[in-house]
């Protein structure tokens, strides 16, 4: 056994009680009824072909076995997670069908083939975590149970065995602070609405778009209980927020003897105060928090606490002592629990690591390549960590990722760091880049680098139903462009693993180079090369074009092709304006707006690109018309201004959550650019400079708009994509 693998097993063993799947591994049997239910939901009639069973783990490592028995496909696993990933392995590499976050393709064959030989695999990494805390803001704040059920099914089938649940924690906070004397109104004013609430749990803000209603608190608890129960059924550990000391701003006034450290601001928002963990009041609050949390959601063994997340200060509090007391409060309530924390922007601090029992840490490392660091055993002082994949920020729809980071660097760090015990899907949004998701989740079951070209060929076959030459050619283009971005060609403070944004979504300016403040400023790959993917996709065999997976990819590639065109066109518009060439300026800006119209029409054809689907989910959570308006504002503002004027303009949070979505493109992004171009055209006509446009007011007007949008797709994606090909004069591939 390699030395690093041996150290990894030791590190994983120290967390054995922290993952329910690992608990299940200790027993050779478990009830497979929940897994059978999942197959029925996802595979429908095909589920009857499977015989599910259990096997013992091999030396502590999870494993699955695929075979045939009595004319059935037999899949056995040592844990629920291993069993389900074994089913997925069969689907991917024998049946050659796909279950993905962005569509399902089961094919037209009634009976899937039996495996020709026995297949056995062991998990390389014991822990397969999913979901950034920001998912609850940028993707899922208003999801219904059917939507969550489907997402959990896909995650479980992808081998995930730990997932954060933040929904419902507002009620835990509510009961905790009510118990020490806060009034109902005071604490509901403090608790933030759902789309912004996870930043409160991380200690970044409070009080946005409140007050939260008691009805909404109850609904969210009911929903969260259902989510947590399903996770446990499928062998997924629910990761719950822990208590590390956030308190309302007036806490010191109510409790003069308490020692509260003001945390200043985060992006223009006043942060919650931080109660000194050495205080008796801290222990009292923590005990109450965990007690109420247990009553509502039961026990877990992983608790997320982000102390000093993106700022904050320890003041005069010794961090080692404070960290020890935070951990002790957790262990007093849950003796075998581990403290999950992010490695991000300087965290975890060295002095924090000094004060804790590092065997009870669970570090999600999403900072390992911000400035490339390879010795995470040294950096984390042996504390167990997971390799985090974060190729998307803000829930944005941008296509692309640093695939070398997944196919090569992940395994390299695993070989050289004995404390690397798992992987973590940590994108800030979900349901984008299904290719990267599929590849990343598979890496926890592979110990060696993957040959990307071969993996893509297999991916194309299962995603579309055949090894179509045009589909393969399109993906060869994608693999050499959007999925070949590098971290060494962008400045340090950029989102180095993400692709560039669409300038259509940017706050208008002739010199703008990104929509959100921290995004890459330039193309991350050859835009001309990328263009060749669309003509190839349009020539995929007709019989393969109707699948949900092909339709999604066609829209995504055509959408990205149009988005990239914005970066070619804007400098031409600027040159015409600077040169006083009004005729060229008007012609070019008409083309710009026409491309945006085409973009909106294209996006309207697919359910994953509809702002109407996002907003439709909000209405069922409201109990009154006033609450409906507040929640609608909450859901809209996270896409546009993000917060109030101070946060939007002063901290430049505007458009951080921008998305290529039908309705949003036409009624918000296009309106901004049309107004801006009209202002510049008037300047060219009159020679007088116009008044500056109040972009926050434009965004806030859309946030408060009552306009409804369809949550159902309409139109023909193929026809519109062909029109885009013609409009952009893309060269058709040779037959």
What are these regions (language model features)?
Residues 25-125:
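Contiguous, structured surface segment used for ligand recognition
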Residues 10-20:
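Bacterial N-terminal signal peptides
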Residues 47-49, 98-99, 104-112, 131-135, ...:
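Catalytic-core regions of glycoside hydrolase
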Residues 72-77, 136-142, 214-215, 276:
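Second-shell loop/turn segments in exported
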Residues 125-144, 155:
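Active-site-adjacent substrate/metal-binding segments within catalytic domains
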Residues 520-543, 555-578:
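C-terminal substrate/ligand-recognition segments
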Residues 658-735:
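Extended, compositionally biased alpha-helical segments that mediate assembly or anchoring
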Residues 2-10:
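Bacterial N-terminal signal peptides that target proteins for export
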């Amino acid at each position: 056994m390699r030395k690093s693998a041996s150290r990894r097993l030791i590190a994983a063993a120290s967390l054995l009680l922290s993952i329910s799947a690992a608990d299940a591994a200790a027993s050779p049997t478990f009830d497979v009824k929940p897994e059978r239910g999942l197959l029925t939901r996802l595979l429908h009639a095909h589920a009857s072909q499977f015989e599910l069973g259990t096997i013992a783990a091999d030396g502590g490592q999870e494993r699955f076995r695929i075979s045939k028995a009595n004319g059935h496909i037999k899949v056995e696993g040592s844990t629920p997670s291993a069993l389900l990933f074994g089913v997925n392995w069969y689907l991917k590499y024998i049946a050659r069908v796909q279950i993905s976050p962005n569509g399902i393709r089961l094919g037209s064959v009634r009976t899937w083939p039996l495996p020709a030989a026995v297949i056995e695999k062991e998990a390389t990494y014991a822990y397969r975590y999913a979901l950034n805390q920001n998912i609850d803001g940028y993707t899922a704040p208003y999801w219904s149970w059917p939507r969550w059920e489907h997402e959990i099914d896909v995650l479980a089938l992808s081998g995930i065995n730990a997932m954060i649940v933040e929904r419902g924690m507002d009620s835990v906070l509510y009961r905790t602070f009510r118990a020490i004397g806060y009034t109902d109104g005071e604490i509901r004013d403090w608790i933030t609405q759902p789309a912004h609430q996870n930043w409160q749990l991380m200690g970044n803000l409070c009080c946005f778009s409140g007050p939260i209603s008691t009805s909404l608190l109850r609904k969210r608890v009911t929903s969260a209980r259902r989510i947590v129960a399903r996770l446990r059924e499928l062998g997924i550990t629910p990761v719950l927020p822990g208590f590390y000391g956030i308190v309302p701003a007036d806490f010191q006034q109510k409790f003069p003897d308490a020692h509260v450290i003001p945390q200043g601001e985060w992006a223009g928002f006043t942060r919650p105060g931080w109660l000194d963990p050495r205080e008796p009041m801290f222990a009292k609050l923590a005990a109450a928090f965990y007690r109420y949390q247990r009553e509502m959601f039961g026990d877990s063994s992983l608790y997320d606490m982000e102390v000093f997340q993106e700022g904050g200060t320890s003041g005069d509090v010794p961090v080692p002592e404070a960290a020890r007391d935070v951990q002790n409060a957790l262990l007093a309530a849950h003796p075998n629990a581990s403290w999950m924390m992010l490695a991000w922007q300087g965290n975890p601090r060295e002095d924090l690591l000094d004060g804790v029992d590092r065997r009870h840490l669970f570090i999600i490392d999403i900072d390992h390549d911000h400035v490339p660091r390879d010795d995470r055993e040294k950096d984390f002082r042996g504390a167990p960590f997971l390799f985090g994949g974060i190729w998307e920020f803000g829930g944005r729809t941008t296509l692309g990722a640093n695939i070398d980071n997944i196919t090569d660097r992940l395994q390299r760090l695993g070989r050289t760091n004995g404390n690397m015990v798992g992987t973590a899907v940590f994108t800030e949004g979900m349901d984008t880049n299904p290719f990267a998701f599929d590849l990343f989740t598979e890496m926890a079951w592979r110990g060696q680098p993957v040959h990307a070209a071969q993996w893509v060929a297999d991916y194309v076959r299962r995603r579309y139903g055949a090894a179509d030459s045009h589909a393969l050619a399109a993906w060869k283009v994608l693999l050499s462009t959007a999925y070949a971005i590098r971290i060494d060609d962008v400045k340090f403070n950029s989102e180095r693993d993400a692709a560039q944004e669409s300038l259509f979504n940017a706050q208008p300016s002739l010199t703008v180079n990104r929509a959100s403040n921290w995004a890459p400023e330039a193309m991350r790959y050859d835009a001309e090369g990328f263009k060749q993917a669309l003509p190839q996709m349009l020539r995929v065999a007709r019989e393969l074009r109707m699948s949900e997976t092909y339709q999604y990819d066609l829209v995504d590639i055509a959408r990205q092709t149009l988005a990239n065109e914005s970066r070619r066109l804007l400098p031409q518009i600027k040159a015409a304006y600077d040169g006083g060439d009004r005729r060229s300026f008007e012609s070019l800006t008409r083309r710009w707006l026409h491309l945006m119209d085409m973009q909106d029409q294209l996006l309207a054809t697919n359910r994953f690109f509809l702002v109407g689907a996002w907003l439709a989910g909000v209405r069922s959570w409201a109990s009154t018309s006033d609450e409906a308006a507040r929640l609608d504002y909450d859901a809209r503002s996270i896409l546009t201004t993000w917060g109030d004027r101070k946060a939007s303009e002063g901290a430049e949070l505007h458009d951080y959550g921008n998305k290529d979505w039908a309705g949003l493109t036409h009624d918000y992004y296009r309106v901004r650019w049309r107004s801006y171009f009209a202002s510049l055209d008037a300047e060219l006509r009159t020679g007088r400079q116009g008044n500056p446009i109040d972009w926050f007011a434009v965004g806030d007007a859309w946030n408060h708009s009552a306009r409804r949008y369809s949550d159902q797709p309409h139109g023909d994606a193929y026809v519109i994509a062909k029109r885009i090909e013609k409009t952009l004069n893309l060269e058709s591939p040779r037959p």
